[in-house]
């Protein structure tokens, strides 16, 4: 143990100017040296480095190590607060890895809420409620989602924080859209857009949805206009979203906005632009390991290729994306993904498969209003 403590000390001295690259090594040596609290602090630091690099799998492993050590500490308020800080980072990492669809994500946010309730005052309650709203939204429990969104809005209004207000409105417009309550959705989108500042608020996406609030408001505005038959306005709002996307700096935000643009260009019957945006979404998603935007982009890209004559390649891509979506437990937009795959199958000369896929999409919409 003494040797490990000495190695940790030597690393701290040698890399004093920048401890980030060796923080995981120091944590490991401190753990083996019996310095539990020091090891926890360095595992936390190493996880923050991994999160900044979008290395979510590495962050998860480091956070699990830290949490295992926290659970060996004597019960105290300080231990609860330390666990909560780690749990919040675990929520961020799981949300990115599973796009709020995995059971791990729901467990992480549920545990974080339990910890928040054990601490008298915490700035994390808003973030936890927001995460639980997103979990509810992705499982298509729209009423629960909107109720949690309004809890977020009450906290944001009490604090008067512009960034939290942006994200509270962001939480509300999604479930209202899927419930078909378009006036409420528009009201929250307008309020969020009025407050949004890219330099200040894009980075919030790491904790709030793994996508940019402004891009979401713009492309969902396009969806509302399309849903209500105002196709010209749908084009205008989608073009605003695409222009905004080119200014974004975080890869997850770019992948999300481009993937949704691909879906909406399908609705607008524009396979050329669907191909361009879906291809960008796929490129970023594959490079960074984003499953949700990867399968959205795959189906949209497949449809766009089939619609332009590359039917074999297109239907193969669309099938791959649909299979990944179903394996992942995706519900939102499942019926549109089915429509794109069905059309690609029809164009490729597979009418029986097309009919089967289309019937599955109709059943999905009947169940989830997705």
Which role fits each region the language model picked out?
Residues 179-199, 209, 213-214:
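Solenoidal tandem-repeat scaffolds enriched in leucines and small polar residues
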Residues 1-129, 135:
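Extended alpha-helical scaffolding segments used for macromolecular assembly and cargo binding
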Residues 44, 57, 61-64, 84, ...:
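Surface-exposed alpha-helical interface segments used for non-catalytic interactions
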Residues 125, 130-132, 136, 140-151, ...:
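Hydrophobic or amphipathic alpha-helical targeting/insertion segments
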Residues 36-40, 48-60, 75-78, 92-107, ...:
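Short coil/turn connectors between adjacent alpha-helices in alpha-solenoid helical repeat scaffolds
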Residues 6-9, 87, 112-114, 153, ...:
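Helix-coil-helix junctions within alpha-helical repeat/solenoid scaffolds
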Residues 14-20, 33, 53-55, 73-77, ...:
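Short coil/turn linkers that connect adjacent helices within long alpha-helical scaffolds
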């Amino acid at each position: 143990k003494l040797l490990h403590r000495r190695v940790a000390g030597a690393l701290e001295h040698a890399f004093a100017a920048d401890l980030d690259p060796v923080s995981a090594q120091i944590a490991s040596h401190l753990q083996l040296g019996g310095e539990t609290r020091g090891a926890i602090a360095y595992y936390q630091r190493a996880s923050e480095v991994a999160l900044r690099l979008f290395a979510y799998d590495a962050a998860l492993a480091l956070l699990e190590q830290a949490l295992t050590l926290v659970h060996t500490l004597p019960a105290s308020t300080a231990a609860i607060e330390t666990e909560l800080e780690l749990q919040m980072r675990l929520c961020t990492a799981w949300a990115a890895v599973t796009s709020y669809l995995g059971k791990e994500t729901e467990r992480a946010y549920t545990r974080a809420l339990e910890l928040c309730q054990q601490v008298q005052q915490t700035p994390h309650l808003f973030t936890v409620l927001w995460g639980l709203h997103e979990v509810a939204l992705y499982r298509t429990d729209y009423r629960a989602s909107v109720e949690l969104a309004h809890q977020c809005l009450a906290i944001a209004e009490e604090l008067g924080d512009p960034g939290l207000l942006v994200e509270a409105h962001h939480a509300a417009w999604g479930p209202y859209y899927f419930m078909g309550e378009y006036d409420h959705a528009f009201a929250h989108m307008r309020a969020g857009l009025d407050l949004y500042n890219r330099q200040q608020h894009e980075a919030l996406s790491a904790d709030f949805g793994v996508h940019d609030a402004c891009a979401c408001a713009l492309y969902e505005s396009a969806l509302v206009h399309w849903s209500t038959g105002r196709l010209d306005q749908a084009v205008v709002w989608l073009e605003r979203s695409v222009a905004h996307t080119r200014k974004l700096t975080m890869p997850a935000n770019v992948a999300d906005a481009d993937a949704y643009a691909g879906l909406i260009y399908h609705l607008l019957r524009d396979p050329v632009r669907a191909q361009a945006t879906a291809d960008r979404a796929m490129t970023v998603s594959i490079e960074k390991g984003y499953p949700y935007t990867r399968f959205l982009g795959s189906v949209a890209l497949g449809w766009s290729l089939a619609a332009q004559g590359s039917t074999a390649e297109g239907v193969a891509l669309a099938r791959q994306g649909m299979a990944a979506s179903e394996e992942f437990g995706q519900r939102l937009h499942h019926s549109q993904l089915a429509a794109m795959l069905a059309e690609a199958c029809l164009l490729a000369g597979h009418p029986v498969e097309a009919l089967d896929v289309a019937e599955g999409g109709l059943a999905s919409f009947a169940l989830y209003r997705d």
